[in-house]
């Protein structure tokens, strides 16, 4: 069974028939798009029969299941995207402009730090979304019999390792935010 076939079977098992499964170019490009209701699988996952590929496909289906059940953290994360994108683009330029024009304690620097904190919040909201999608994937792969025994355990390890990348990214962002607050927070150059 390929990643795409496993994805279709998992979605069907949950009564989700309105989600399309598509192959997308590149590697590590697997994602679920709630706007278009598509599970997008990279070339290396879509046609592969490896346990890892099936696990990745199942994880993306986990997001489709979250969408279908109106999982609150997924909705919250989706609603944050436009604001976070703007904040991510403007935070560092604001900090730099603030430092160059008004010094370390400039209100522009503070605004830049606030905008950066939106990205940190987004990453924190992402954690339960990713862990839940993986848990759903493992549970369904086991209950549907798509994977068995050691294969389920291996998939749990692969998805767990992938989830840790989100934890590491969030931790790095938190440390960067703390660094910005320590460097620039509350300072006045008057």
Predicted regions and their residues:
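Membrane-interface starts of transmembrane alpha-helices
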Residues: 80, 107-114
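Post-HExxH zinc-binding segment in Zn-dependent metallohydrolases
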Residues: 81-105
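Alpha-helical transmembrane segments of multi-pass membrane proteins
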Residues: 98, 115-126
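Helix-coil boundary and interhelical linker segments in multi-pass alpha-helical membrane proteins
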Residues: 100-110, 186-190
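Polar-ligand-bearing catalytic/cofactor-coordination segments
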Residues: 1-87, 121-190
């Amino acid at each position: 069974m390929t990643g795409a076939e496993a994805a279709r079977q998992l979605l069907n098992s949950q009564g989700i028939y309105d989600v399309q499964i598509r192959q997308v170019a590149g590697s590590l490009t697997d994602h679920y798009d709630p706007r278009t209701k598509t599970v997008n699988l990279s070339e290396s996952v879509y046609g592969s029969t490896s346990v890892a590929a099936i696990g990745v496909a199942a994880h993306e289906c986990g997001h489709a299941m979250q969408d279908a059940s109106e999982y609150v953290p997924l909705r919250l994360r989706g609603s944050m995207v436009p604001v976070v994108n703007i904040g991510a683009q403007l935070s560092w330029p604001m900090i730099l402009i603030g430092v160059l024009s008004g010094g370390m304690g400039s209100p522009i620097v503070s605004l830049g730090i606030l905008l950066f904190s939106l990205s940190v919040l987004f990453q924190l909201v992402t954690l339960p979304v990713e862990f839940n999608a993986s848990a759903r994937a493992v549970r369904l792969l086991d209950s549907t019999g798509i994977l068995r025994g050691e294969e389920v355990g291996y998939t749990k390890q692969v998805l767990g390792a992938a989830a840790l990348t989100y934890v590491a990214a969030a931790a790095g962002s938190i440390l960067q935010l703390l660094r910005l607050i320590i460097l620039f927070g509350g300072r006045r150059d008057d």
